[in-house]
Amino acid sequence: MYTILPNGIRVFYREAGSPSKPTILLLHGFPASSFQFRNLIPLLAEKYHVVAPDLPGFGFTEIPDNLNFKYSFANIATTIGSFLDVHKIDKFAVYVFDYGAPTGFRLALECPQAITAIISQNGNAYEEGLSSFWDPLRQLWATSDPVKEKELRQAVKGAVLTFEATKGQYLGGEPEPNKIDEPATYHLDYALMSRPGNAEIQLDLFKDYGTNVVLYPKFQEYLRESQVPVLAVWGKNDIIFPPAGAEAFKRDVKDLKLVLLDGGHFLVESHTQEIGRLMLEFLDSKI
């Protein structure tokens, strides 16, 4: 279903559960969409109101051509904030994964009183949570030379925006990949990334990701000052956001439950039932 924002953006989202119940906002990551939560949502919806929007540039959210929308994490967070305003959601627990993490933490900086709890599933807010995967992207963040930037964008495109790399994000780090291989996930993601102009959107966001790293100290300050309860449930074999990022929450979060599972980046695909159970136990005791 869609919500039309005041600026004309059509946000596609999935929703389940009664709006009279506490809300859980599910924020997906690269290269996915709210489709990644298709199996988790029913596990949560009996007790909670669950909302999962597609971020701008992903899934089926539509940006009007005449809006001249700049694809940045600041604008993604602003868009999701507007989506929440339209739905009159002013209190919510937030599940952050991959790109959903800087989106969720930016929302928290804007409205710290809105967040009732955080579930971080490989959703990073610490330098030590960035693996060597990010080294070429650090070069992209650092350069201001247009020629060098063009070369780096092409290199990143060839390494990351491919079908093989997309499939690898789902199956990498999984001890038994054949048992959790769901081709619809990576085929859908790659098809959506293959739309005209979408590769440039993804490269713009890779370039902009450095602005999130600059904000990591602010995200950490928020965690310390708000003392929001955090469930960090991570795939310990993630080569993009390694478990050191989960361990780092210990520095700033007093009310922390940390669980490392034998899986990779897309842990919600391989450990859906376990994540659902952990979330329900955690949220039932916190909100």
Regions found by a protein language model. Give the residues of each.
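Flexible "cap/lid" subdomain of the alpha/beta-hydrolase fold that forms the substrate-access gate
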Residues: 1-19, 23, 31, 51, ...
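The serine-hydrolase catalytic nucleophile loop
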Residues: 30-41
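Recognition helices and adjacent regulatory flanks at domain boundaries
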Residues: 36, 55-58
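Conserved ATPase "switch" residues in P-loop NTPase domains
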Residues: 44-45, 250
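Active-site machinery of serine-nucleophile hydrolases
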Residues: 45-54
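Conserved SAM/SAH-binding loop
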Residues: 263
